[in-house]
Amino acid sequence: MNKLITSEHAENLPTVRIKKAILKDFKNVGYGEIIFNCGRQFVPYNTEADILGIYGQNGSGKTSFIEALSILQDLMAGAAVSGAYADCVAIGKKFSELEFIFDLQYKNGIIREATYSFCLSRKKLSEDEIHEKYKDAPDDFEIPDEDYKVVVFNERFSLIWENASKRQVIIDTSSKESPFIPTTKRKEIAGSGKKTLVSLEVNKQLAYEKSRSFIFMMETLQLFAENDNKTLFFQVLVELRLFARNYLF
């Protein structure tokens, strides 16, 4: 992570808080929305951490939310989501949708709002993938005939910043013809060279196969950094990645 953050950037890192979370067709939650009080008004920079509690009756979705946070942490930290979460898609649904809104407050008083959303489904493992997954299992372990992994797709990153009048989509991976859209933002963040375009396509496929985030995987962020590590969009991405790796849990 230090390779992605310059010394100048390190001097103005924000306090990051989750402001809102939306879960759709995730486990027993058809639609769930949580708004955190800490995001409703300005909290002075570098103040003590907020203490929030979630309460509700059995089956109200508390555990589902914690599991959604765990998935979020894995994705934003650039790690693979465990296959244990493959069963989180609601019964009878093809995929789940999760959305998280973040409040970023900086030392200089600037406040930005970032949104990261994605879809989650499950995919049956091939025989080779099953053998690879359980290659270190004890001899007496019974390897299952079938198993599943998590598939992450349709990632979307948008941002409201000090010079923007409204939320703007920065990265949308739902396109089949391009690694991500809008094209203007892709060229600004990653450059327009053919080699970069091929590398982005490879990363997108790798992320899909390995249950990772295309946006937050190190391979993608390094491409962005090589193009320009001082763009606002790149810096917010690495700030969110730092938050996930060190402060989310």
Please place each PLM-identified region on the residue numbering.
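Generic structural hydrophobic/aromatic packing signal, biased to beta-strands
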Residues: 21, 34, 54, 98-100, ...
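Surface-exposed loop/turn and secondary-structure junction residues enriched for glycine/proline
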Residues: 32, 74, 224-227
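Residues at beta-strand starts and edge strands
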Residues: 17, 30, 94-98, 112-114, ...
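Residue-level signal for short segments within beta-strands and strand-turn junctions
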Residues: 25, 38, 104, 122, ...
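Short, low-complexity, polar/charged sequence segments that are solvent-exposed and flexible
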Residues: 39-43, 73, 118-122, 177-181
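Pre-Walker A-like glycine/lysine-rich segment at the N-terminus of P-loop NTPase domains
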Residues: 2-71
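Electropositive, glycine-dotted interaction segments
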Residues: 121-249
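Conserved P-loop NTP-binding catalytic core
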Residues: 66-140
